[in-house]
Amino acid sequence: MKKILPLIVISQFLSTSLWFAGNAVLPDLAKELNLAPEYLGHLTSAVQFGFIAGTLVFAILTIADKFSPSWVFFWSSVLASIFNFAVRLEDISALQILILRFGTGFFLAGIYPVGMKIASDYFKKGLGKSLGFLIGALVLGTAFPHLVRSLLDPLPWKYVIDATSILALIGGFLIVAFVPNGPYRKKSQGFDFTVFFKVFQTKSIRSAAYGYFGHMWELYAFWAFLPFILQYFNSIHSLNLDTAFWSFMIIAVGSISCSVAGLLSGKFSPKSIASFALTVSGICCIISPLLIFQDSQGVLLVFLMVWGLAVTADSPMFSTMVAQNAPESSRGTSLTIVNSVGFAITIVSIQLLNLLSVHINPVYLFLVLGLGPVLGLIGLGFRSRNQALK
């Protein structure tokens, strides 16, 4: 049992490295295919759209609850790797890349939420700690392609695609080979096409979901446009920050806050931790223009590292609240559905920033993200009218 959590965490890290693989090589793709600046938003949204479509299919068919989640994770890793690898094919068009990234996102739906389902099948007590490490692995996996791009900078961008595809395959193999069905797994008895609506009938899940939706408005848009902001900072201050490396560092540091939040969930309520994180990240949104406009790269990087810590710390807490309050027979489906709606929201915020990036001074771009933490805190406040969240 002691080896199970590290195996799940490592597998999650390896397989979710596919998520931002396209973003990490976007500068190279832009030069090779003469892509417009707004392609960044479209590339990120393609993965998110795929993930949403995947989560809807997985949820409606209750795949994670009806079939062995380890095998679901494995086959999803294999198929996501294939779609990811295909991006490196010769004479590929910008549209074809978007379609392939959609396919990668679709099968990521069988990796991220299913990984949480596997963890919840093993750890009834200390679930917050387990999910803290697990989502920390997701964050690190998301950041990892930026590090690979930085380390392999002199080499062709296709090496980044190769590396992430191979890592995802290894992650899937580790799960199916060494992580059997958990002791708390309760198999679903059949397909339930009304499950989407049933999830939000539970007040405790609904409150946690509202907080999560506010969190998601901010998170992926911040991650997606972080390299853009760093490049803009370089241009207005005539600096030469390593955009890929610092994008990795700022995103990856969130894995630490996820893990720490998970450990603290044994002493403090998940709601309290999530509320604190939302408050800090909301403040970061509001003061971001001041920090981007000033010319000290040290000050900016410290600020963005703090933001990187705060923007992710609440994520495992929301997943913990959903998992703890969902019926055992539909826990995986509940997590998948809440994820699906959350990622739908990320598309709106990403495309909004994509639109604004060509119409307003980029210094003010992240102000829009402040709406998420505010609404998230309001959503969590609904708990005061019911005591279901623990």
Predicted regions and their residues:
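Helix-to-loop junctions at the C-terminal end of transmembrane segments
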Residues: T55-S68, C258-P270, S357
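C-terminal transmembrane helical hairpin of 12-TM major facilitator-type secondary transporters
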Residues: S269-F318
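Extracytoplasmic gate region of multi-pass secondary transporters
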Residues: G22-N23, S204-S255
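A late C-terminal transmembrane helix in Major Facilitator Superfamily
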Residues: N325-I360
